[in-house]
Amino acid sequence: MRVSKSLILITLSALVISFAEAYDPSPLQDFCVAIDDLKNGVFVNGKFCKDPKQAKAEDFFFSGLNQAGSTNNKVRSNVTTVNVDQIPGLNTMGISLVRIDYAPYGQNPPHTHPRATEILVLIEGTLYVGFVSSNQDNNRLFAKVLYPGDVFVFPIGMIHFQVNIGKTPAVAFAGLSSQNAGVITIADTVFGSTPPINPDILAQAFQLDVNIVEDLEAKFRN
């Protein structure tokens, strides 16, 4: 994969998000570089901001998205996040970025971003992606097969997923309309909570035998 091609696609994704109305509060200053020093900062949008006169280029910089993340895990995918924790200068900017690597037949399992809409562009490989609408919309599935250069949008708060349906690795980049979009992975949340949800509740909710629920909870707690 040519680096120049990736950078162009990343830039296009970022521009699309930046022209949209951000979900995070709009900044009232040029920038607000996040710091952990409580004595020399002003609290804005969940972070303390350093004195603007002390800001430097490194506060707005991240290096490493040219490197593939390890997919040696149960879901065979890896998400490399670039948000306000990696780039302090993103504070109050209402935008962040991720790189997603998928092994053959790997997936980014069903999850939601409670604070952001996501726009994803596929760089290489073949993905089956989709999201499910709310109960009020009868939980409709919106899904597509993506090829390199294709773009798909996941609305804020909607459960969505991506699956590599090809025999080769896949790579995607996604922009998110929040400096800290958050992520809730459905299976991990429901079956791996601390403390665990009462198995009887989940058995009734999912219409499963309680023994199956207990087995699922044991798997997701490990």
From Swiss-Prot:
Record CDD domains: cupin_OxOx
GO cellular component, one term: apoplast
Superkingdom: Eukaryota
PROSITE patterns: GERMIN
The Cupin type-1 domain, residue ranges: 63-214
Matching SUPFAM superfamilies: RmlC-like cupins
Entry-listed glycosylation sites: 78
Alphabetical list of InterPro entries matching this protein: Cupin_1, Germin, Germin_Mn-BS, RmlC-like_jellyroll, RmlC_Cupin_sf
Pfam families per record: Cupin_1
Signal peptide annotation: 1-18
Family: Belongs to the germin family.
Localization: Secreted, Extracellular space, Apoplast
Subunit comment: Oligomer (believed to be a pentamer but probably hexamer).
The name this protein goes by in its record: Germin-like protein subfamily 1 member 13
Job of this protein: May play a role in plant defense. Probably has no oxalate oxidase activity even if the active site is conserved.
GO MF term list: manganese ion binding
Residues binding Mn(2+): 111, 113, 118, 160
Gene symbol of the encoding locus: GLP6
Disulfide bonds, paired cysteine numbers: 32-49
Alphabetical keyword list: Apoplast, Disulfide bond, Glycoprotein, Manganese, Metal-binding, Secreted, Signal
PANTHER family, per the entry: GERMIN-LIKE PROTEIN SUBFAMILY 3 MEMBER 3
